[in-house]
């Protein structure tokens, strides 16, 4: 057991998404779309680490998106296909998928996933996603954590200024960030976690 897991066992913190039910996740999607004034009807949406497809399924019902999901679990993808027969689902490593896909997207979701990758890998992933976003498209990084927070024993938290530095390097991306607890409410969200929205503003 690593230090992060031990801390979570003692304090009950960590893995906030495990506390969230279907209704919570659907409300998060709705509030994020409202905040960015996004109309995704008929557009391609990619969920990297899609789990059982709760977010994609909600968007499919509400906005008739073209859903794409990537996950390592066969069982998760089986559930996705049951919910969305017309979806496109891949059992693949996220970086390997991003290396081969030719599809362009108007939203890419990375909720509770990016911290599983090293900081260098996170830079690579975001750069690859930027290349497959349409102009006006949004990368939603949920459950982001920083090294100075109570998540200092998390697998790979990022340093303060990480996203500002990325956007200074990649001028095609615009940054917006907010507290998940403030926006989504209901007390299930850790005040140290943020949602990061990176919008592609130019080629």
Regions found by a protein language model. Give the residues of each.
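A short glycine-rich, Lys/Arg-flanked "PGG" loop and its adjoining helix->strand segment in the class I
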Residues: 123-135
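Conserved class I S-adenosyl-L-methionine
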Residues: 43-49
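A short glycine-leucine-enriched loop at secondary-structure breakpoints
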Residues: 102
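Short catalytic micro-motifs in class I SAM-dependent methyltransferases
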Residues: 112-113
């Amino acid at each position: 057991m690593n230090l992060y897991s031990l801390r979570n066992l003692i304090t009950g913190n960590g893995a906030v998404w495990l506390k969230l039910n279907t209704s919570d996740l659907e409300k998060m999607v709705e509030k994020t779309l409202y905040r960015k004034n996004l109309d995704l009807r008929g557009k391609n949406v990619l969920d990297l680490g899609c789990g059982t497809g709760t977010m994609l399924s909600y968007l499919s019902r509400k906005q008739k998106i073209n859903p794409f999901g990537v996950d390592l679990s066969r069982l998760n993808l089986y559930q996705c296909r049951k919910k969305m027969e017309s979806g496109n689902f891949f059992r693949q490593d996220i970086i390997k998928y991003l290396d081969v896909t030719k599809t362009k997207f108007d939203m890419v979701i990375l909720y509770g996933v990016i911290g599983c990758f090293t900081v260098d890998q996170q830079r690579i992933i975001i750069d690859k996603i930027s290349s497959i976003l349409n102009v006006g498209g949004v990368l939603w990084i949920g459950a982001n954590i920083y090294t100075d927070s109570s998540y200092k024993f998390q697998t790979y938290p990022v340093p303060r200024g990480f996203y500002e530095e990325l956007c200074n390097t990649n001028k095609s991306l615009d940054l917006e960030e907010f507290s998940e607890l403030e926006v989504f409410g209901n007390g299930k969200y850790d005040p140290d976690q943020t949602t990061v929205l990176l919008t592609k503003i130019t080629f």
